[in-house]
Structure formats: C-alpha cells, structure tokens
C-alpha cells in the first residue's frame, strides 16, 4: 500500500540541535513495508526520552516523538493478514522518534508509520488522548520484567505465560506467587524505584497481575497515587534511610529491583535495599558501573525499549545496536497479551494532563519535563488536524 507524497507539519531536529515546528517536514515513505501501518495522528504523549535527543542523539530533519494515537490510513499486507488491521481502525502506537535510520517517522507529526506488533486497537470507550499514553512504557517494562529480569508472567498474562517463558537468569531465585486473586500465601517481592512515573505505575500493575508483592519508592506527595495502582508498600525516595527502611520491611530478603529512574542515586538505593544474598537489578537506562561494582552478588542489566521493534537502532553507544529478533518475537507475543489486558479493562493508563495546544504546545511540554515541572502525570496533546 502507499500513502500520499506530500509534506506535513511535524516537530523536527534543527541544524543547531533544537526541536522546532516545521510545516515542510517529509511524510513517511509512500511504500509501506509488509507489517507497517500508516496512521493519521490525533494525539501524542510525551516521555522523558523526548528531552534527551541532544548531541549525537540529535539528527537534523528527523521527526521526534515516540507515542501517539490515531486512525489507520493504510496497511502493509502482513499487517492486514496477521494482525487484522485496516483503514479506519483507531490505534495507539509505540515507535522510535529522532531515528537517524528512519528520519521521516516520528510521533510528533500529522502522519506516522508503526510496525503492526507495536500497535494496539483502541477500546471503543476510549478517546485518542487517553490512548496516546499507551505504548512505550507497557512494552519496555514487560521486556524488562518478563525477559531481562526473568520473572514468570503467570496465568493472568496469557499468551505470554505459555508462549514465551522467561529465560534462566543468574542468580537463581525461587519465585513464590499464588494466583493474583487466589487469596493468601507467600509472594515474592519486587522493588519498583520510581513508582509514580509512567513506567512505574505500569510496572506495579503488571507485577500485581503476575502475582508479586510490590514495594515502591516515590516522593511522599505521590504515595496515594502509587498505592492506587497496587503497590503494597511505598517509601519516600528522598529519605536518608530509605534503603535501610526497605531492607527492614523485606526482612533483608529483597532480591529483585526494577529501576524506572536510573540515576547513580537510584541505583545506589536499589543496591542498598537488596538483601544480603544479592539478586537482580534491571534499569530502563544505562546504570552507573561504579555503583554496580559495589556488590558482586547483584546481577545488573538494562533495557532499551526501541529494541522491541526488531530493527537496527542507529543511536550512538551504548544505545546503538543491530536488530534483535528475540526482542521482536517477545513483542509479538506481548502485544497480543497487552491487547487482551486492555480489552478486558485489566490495566489503567498513567494519570494524564491533556492539553489542546497541538504540536506547538508539545514544545512547551518538553520544557516542562526538562525543568521537572511534571510529576505523577503524563503530558498528552491533541492535534488540530
């Protein structure tokens, strides 16, 4: 299938390293690949990564943004046959913006393209703004928990549970998880650092569905928010004794930690909270090697969300890498799992602040994120198209 060959309005990289609004940005390639889907964008959401596309990560002329919702305008043959997608479908998508290998594809635009396995069909009772916040968090966190950390997904997360069992990871950890709604019984605990972030509330929900107890950190003002998403206990990340408090709460037995913030301080917090026998630490960005070297009994790893698209990542090291077929295979199974969770109302999106100022307003939103004026909510912008 083809899309029309005209220019569009989009946020693109400028020659001087800024993000600017352009009315002459290129449309995505007119010829869709087999599993690609073309979408008329109706709403976009912002992520911290959108503010980090500077220096060698910045490509002049490339379109920025990685989450959007809209209406399908054209599909490749595989997107239709394998995923049942067609023109007129309302979808949300997770893609890689500011992509030097595909500079005409990004979320902050009137038109975009996404691989079918990174698209979700919207619920009938959802608007585009609500759906725009789905995407990267739900894919990246699932990859971090149920593959890289090696946690079992459990029967509530089918077909992932049976079709993609987790690989063996070191150190070996015994997991005790009754069915999520099966009453009492011992449950393995996972720490979520950054519980009030969009990835944090996503992680809490997925861990609870998988049958884990969740201990989270956040600022004190967001305690109620974090608890409302299912955290069993919440600790103030700014407290000098937070690591010791978590260690006491878990009786020196914590062995699993997901770091949704990933600074030297949060890595240090997680390492300090993990019990005497060590465990596994997974972050959503590269972690401090210095901190990681402080405890040999803790195995550290980190994940890169765009890897799930299965394509080469053209960003510089340490993010740049060849396409990962294993990540794509995981994502295809996870996509069907996530669609099922969405359809049956088993998950909630992160709290949103919706603005109707379009792509021009996104520039203001990026400044809000840079200046740390956003906490416990996700910025979403509807487009006047």
UniProtKB/Swiss-Prot annotation:
Query: In the UniProt record, does the keyword Lyase occur?
Result: no
* Record-level Gene Ontology MF annotations: nucleotide binding; oxidoreductase activity, acting on NAD(P)H
Query: Binding positions for NADP(+)?
Result: 49-52, 196-199, 219-222, 284-285, 374-375
Indicate yes or no for the key word Repeat: no
The residues the record assigns to binding substrate are 136-143, 305-309
Q: Which domain of life is it from?
A: Eukaryota
Q: Which SMART domains did the record assign?
A: PKS_ER
Task: Quickly give the catalysed reaction.
Answer: (2S,4S)-4-hydroxy-4-methylglutamate + 8 malonyl-CoA + 3 S-adenosyl-L-methionine + ATP + 8 NADPH + 11 H(+) = (2S)-3-[(2S)-3,5-dioxo-4-[(2E,4R,6R,8E,10E,12E)-4,6,12-trimethyltetradeca-2,8,10,12-tetraenoyl]pyrrolidin-2-yl]-2-hydroxy-2-methylpropanoate + AMP + 3 S-adenosyl-L-homocysteine + 8 CO2 + diphosphate + 8 NADP(+) + 8 CoA + 6 H2O; (2S,4R)-4-hydroxy-4-methylglutamate + 8 malonyl-CoA + 3 S-adenosyl-L-methionine + ATP + 8 NADPH + 11 H(+) = (2R)-3-[(2S)-3,5-dioxo-4-[(2E,4R,6R,8E,10E,12E)-4,6,12-trimethyltetradeca-2,8,10,12-tetraenoyl]pyrrolidin-2-yl]-2-hydroxy-2-methylpropanoate + AMP + 3 S-adenosyl-L-homocysteine + 8 CO2 + diphosphate + 8 NADP(+) + 8 CoA + 6 H2O
The record's InterPro entries line, in alphabetical order, gives: ADH-like_C, ADH-like_N, GroES-like_sf, NAD(P)-bd_dom_sf, PKS_ER, Trans-enoyl_RdTase-like
Q: In which pathway does it act?
A: Secondary metabolite biosynthesis
Top class in the EC scheme: oxidoreductase
Stated EC number for the protein is: 1.-.-.-
Keywords from the UniProt entry:
NADP, Nucleotide-binding, Oxidoreductase
* Pfam families associated with the record: ADH_N, ADH_zinc_N
Cross-referenced PANTHER family: HYPOTHETICAL OXIDOREDUCTASE (EUROFUNG), TRANS-ENOYL REDUCTASE STHE
The text of the family note is: Belongs to the zinc-containing alcohol dehydrogenase family.
- Role description: Trans-enoyl reductase; part of the gene cluster that mediates the biosynthesis of the tetramic acids Sch210971 and Sch210972, potential anti-HIV fungal natural product that contain a decalin core. The PKS module of tasS together with the enoylreductase tasC catalyze the formation of the polyketide unit which is then conjugated to 4-hydroxyl-4-methyl glutamate (HMG) by the condensation domain of the tasS NRPS module.
Q: How does it assemble?
A: Monomer.
Q: What is this protein called?
A: Trans-enoyl reductase tasC
User: Species name for this entry?
Assistant: Hapsidospora irregularis
What taxonomic ancestry is recorded?
Answer: Eukaryota, Fungi, Dikarya, Ascomycota, Pezizomycotina
């Amino acid at each position: 299938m083809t899309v029309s060959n005209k220019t569009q309005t989009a946020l693109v990289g400028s020659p001087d390293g800024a993000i600017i609004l352009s009315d002459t940005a290129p449309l995505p390639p007119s010829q869709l690949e087999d599993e690609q889907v073309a979408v008329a964008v109706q709403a976009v959401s912002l992520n911290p990564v959108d503010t980090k596309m500077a220096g060698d990560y910045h490509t002049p002329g490339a379109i920025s943004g990685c989450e959007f919702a809209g209406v399908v305008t054209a599909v490749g043959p595989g997107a239709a046959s394998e995923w049942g997608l067609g023109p007129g479908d309302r979808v949300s998508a997770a893609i890689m913006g500011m992509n030097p290998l595909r500079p005409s594809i990004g979320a902050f635009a009137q038109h975009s393209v996404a691989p079918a396995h990174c698209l979700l069909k919207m619920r009938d009772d959802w608007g585009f703004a609500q759906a725009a916040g789905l995407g990267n968090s739900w894919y990246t966190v699932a990859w971090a928990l149920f593959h890289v950390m090696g946690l079992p997904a459990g029967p509530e997360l089918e077909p992932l549970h049976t079709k993609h069992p987790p690989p063996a990871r070191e150190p070996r950890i015994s997991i005790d998880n009754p069915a999520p709604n099966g009453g009492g019984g011992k449950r393995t605990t996972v720490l979520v650092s950054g519980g009030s972030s969009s990835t944090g509330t996503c992680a809490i929900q997925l861990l609870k569905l998988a049958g884990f107890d969740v201990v989270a950190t956040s600022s004190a003002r967001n305690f109620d928010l974090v608890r409302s998403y299912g955290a069993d206990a919440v600790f103030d990340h700014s407290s000098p004794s937070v690591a010791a408090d978590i260690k006491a709460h878990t009786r020196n037995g914590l062995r699993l930690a997901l770091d949704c913030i990933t600074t030297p301080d949060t890595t240090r917090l997680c390492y300090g909270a993990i019990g005497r026998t060590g465990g596994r630490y997974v972050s959503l960005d590269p972690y401090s090697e210095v901190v990681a070297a402080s405890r040999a009994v803790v195995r550290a790893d980190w994940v890169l969300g765009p890897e799930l698209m299965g394509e080469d990542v053209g960003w510089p090291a340490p993010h740049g890498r060849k396409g990962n077929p294993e990540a794509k295979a995981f994502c295809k199974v996870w996509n069907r799992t996530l669609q099922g969770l969405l359809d049956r109302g088993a998950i909630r999106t992160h709290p949103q602040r919706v603005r109707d100022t379009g792509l021009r307003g996104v520039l203001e939103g990026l400044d809000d994120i840079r200046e740390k004026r956003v906490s416990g909510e996700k910025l979403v912008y509807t487009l006047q198209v």
